[in-house]
């Protein structure tokens, strides 16, 4: 399985606020063009939810349904695909305090389920996933930059 980690720092937003925005899946389509649709079912007895996603992916759309498990005290969300276009898609979001705001870490493991083309397709899918996560975070949180790097100065 291909592993992807994206760490971005959101400027001027505290971790609790960032976590609440990232947890509010229903708002994604109105805040970023990358996510075309999200349907969230009512919470299950254990607090997890099932959500159905339609996301722009290169020149097409990827669709999947996932189980999302929220950990507000840790400001983290774990997800696992239940069905959809990936063979496997699972990972997490985490929000941590940073002197200038919040560092958001997105981790995912995925398998497109086409072993004979994995060497060609996986790097493209990884790049697209990284770009999509950055666009999603910009839409949700505003100014973001790769963790550890300062945003570009304009003047």
Model region roles, listed by residue range:
Residues 109-132:
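A short acidic/glycine-rich loop-to-helix N-cap element
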Residues 3, 13, 80, 118-125:
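Residue-level detector of alpha-helix boundaries and kinks
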Residues 24-27, 100, 125, 129, ...:
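Amphipathic alpha-helical protein-protein interaction surfaces
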Residues 49-51:
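Short, well-structured hydrophobic secondary-structure segments
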Residues 1-46, 154-155:
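Hydrophobic ligand-binding cavity/cleft-lining segments
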Residues 14-20, 128-132, 136:
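Short amphipathic alpha-helical segments
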Residues 29-33, 37-44, 54-103, 109-111, ...:
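Hydrophobic-ligand binding "helix-grip"
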